[in-house]
Each structure stands twice: as C-alpha cells, then as structure tokens.
C-alpha cells in the first residue's frame, strides 16, 4: 500500500521551532552556570529563524496539510510574525529581571518557546482537535512558567489557581466541541460550517454547544464573568511571566476566535453575537470600575486587560471584514501598550525590590525623566488619548460597531472608556507631581533602552499613521475568509 507524505510546507515554522527547542534544552544542559545567557541568545536566534521561515513560505493562497487539519494563510502567517516579535521583546525586557531572581535558566526559555509553538498551532488550526492541542500546549507551558519561582508562595498559589480554572475552562470548551461533533459528525471547521449552512443538524444542540464554547473562549480572553483568574495570576506571577501571559497569547486568542466562531460557526453569528454583547459590556464595565480601586499596579493592569478585551469583542460583534480587522488592529495596539507598561515596571524593579505598587512609580520623572515619558505615552495610549495608537484602535472598533447599527453599544463603550481614563491618568500624576519614595537611580542596559524607545515611538507613529497596520490587518482578514 502506498503511503503519501503530507506537504509539510505550511508547518515548516512549527517544525523548525520544535527542533530548536530541543537544541535550547540540550545546550542549556551542558552550558553550566557561567554560560546561562546561551539559552537566551539561542531563543532569540530561534525566533529570528522562525520569522525567516514564515516569510519564506508566506503566500496569500490558502495551503492545507495533515488531511486539512492544519492551514497556512495570510492571517496565520501575519499573526505568527507578530507573535515572534512580541516574544522576542518579552525576552529582552525580562533578561535582567529574571537574572536577578534566579529564573535565568533553560526551563524559562524552553517553556516560552513551547508556549510560542502552542500559539502558532492555534492560529493555523483548521480542526477542533488541532485547536484544542494548540491551546493545551500553550496553557500547560504558562502554568509551569507561573510556578517557576518555586520559593515564592504567592507564585505557587497563582499557578494552582491558574491550573484549576484553566482545566475548568478546557472542560467547558471540550464539552462544547463534543456537542458540535455530535450534531454534525465532523471535527473539520470547514465541514462544520457546511453542515450548519445546510440546516441539516439540530439547531438547539448547536446552541448548547455554542454556549460552552463561548464560555471557554471567554476564559482565554479573560472576559467577564470568566475573568476571575486574571488579577490573581497577574499579581502572583513574576513580572516577566505576567508580561508574557498578557501579550503574545492575545494574538493566539484572536486567531482562535477567528477560526472557531467566524470560520466554523459563522452561520450562527446572530446567536454568538448576543452572547458576545453581554461579555463585552460586562468586561468593559467590571474592568474599568474595578481597576479604579486597585493599589497594586499589576492587578490594575489585569483589570485594564479585561476592559480592553471587551473592546476586542466589540469588533467581533460588528462582524464583517471591517469589524474583524479593527479587532485585530486593537489586539496589536493592546500588545504594544502592554509590552511598554510591564517592560517599564520591570526596569523600575531591581534585585530585592518589586515595583508592584502604584506608589512605587511616585516621582519617576525625577529619577529617570526618559522612562517617565515612555510610561506617559503608554498610559495616554491606554486611555485612548490622541494621537496615540490606543485612540485609533478604539476609534476603528467603534466605527465598525456604529456601521453595524449598535449605536447604544458605542455610547456605553465611550462612557466606560471615560471612567477608565481616571486610573491611567492617576499614574501620570504619581510620576510627575509626587515626591519619589525611592531615590536610587534606575540603571539598565543600552539594548533595553533602545527597545523601550522603539516601543514608545511605535505607539506614537502607528497612532498618527495607522493606515499601513490597518491595511495589513484588513488584508489578513480578507485572505482568510
């Protein structure tokens, strides 16, 4: 019997990354204590190699492999490139932080790369099992990363909470997927869409399955009422891990929603739109209101994330190419702002001191004016003040929602954004108008200063000239639908 090998081309980046993870682990095993940075540089080299491979196979044509379970298209390739850049930035920001806290070891970098592999699989999944495998690879890596600082009781507690709630969410998702399979007899997303479109299956079973699927998605996006894990994990995890959790996985979550809700369950749009409206409004309300009361800056940014995810969901509610592309643009803007915020928090932290309270930023302008200015740009952008990228991201989503006819939703979103501006501007007040509690100057390596500068510059320039990034998002959506 002849055995035909599948065309591995769409999966070349994943195969390359998997091989390089093995190299990183072996190199770290034999490197010894004096060469601990070897795993760091190999990880950056791996991400650069993945980017080159992805660019080499990039095409606007849709390519399938592994009997249609894995897909390569413009959206998956662009999301993967964004994931590589984000993970590389996280590693550079985190280098000094993890070095002074005993986390500069191969396990940290191996887990980060395995999590990256999970994200890549998620954005290229064309099958419910592939989606779930990518999600679990990402989730299990993140659980281990949170618990990596074994001597920290709060980190261990956060990891246990993350694991238990994550397992519950995975159960919801699996149950929903099993209902969809029971109703259609297929796990392939295109086949699922065909059966739904034909109207052959029982609509009630679809709705039950859809409820569980949306609940699982809500957890992964930290949307209310499935947000309980986010504040505790953001606060309890080492800041480097918090930055990782709060940045790159959002691209994977966006790809997950696009593949499952839009690609597989697109004909049920009127059903899942109603569910997403509830999640979006609740997320924006709870996130913005709860953030006001926080004194811990990591918890505040966790609630901020919840409110931002509400805006991301608005793009899916608007539907259509404009809605989905504005949602993708918002995710890019959010990740850019998150990198800047947590990167600066890690720079303010030092050995034996964690800058995890809002008051720790008091007088930052006197200690390091340049760093304070970068944080000011990030906070202005998060608040949605022009000409920052955060303003245009909010504007593009609201325009799409308005075009879809949800005028009341636009009014609610604007009102809740105004409430949210308070806690962002409060940080600026602490940095510029309060006396510093710490007088020690803030020192860091030149490459980190360059990265923060690029981060801040991108927030301004992409806000003033968003056409290229918006066009990229629109192109990715058009070629994947």
Swiss-Prot record:
Q: Where exactly are the transmembrane stretches of this chain? A: 11-31, 37-57, 74-94, 103-123, 128-148, 162-182, 205-225, 238-258, 272-292, 300-320, 328-348, 371-391, 405-425, 457-477
Q: Where in the cell is it found?
A: Cell inner membrane
Please identify the protein, giving its name as recorded: NADH-quinone oxidoreductase subunit N
Record flagged with keyword Membrane:
yes
What PANTHER family does this protein's entry cite?
Answer: NADH DEHYDROGENASE
Q: Record's family?
A: Belongs to the complex I subunit 2 family.
Main location per the UniProt record: membrane
Originating organism: Nitrosomonas europaea (strain ATCC 19718 / CIP 103999 / KCTC 2705 / NBRC 14298)
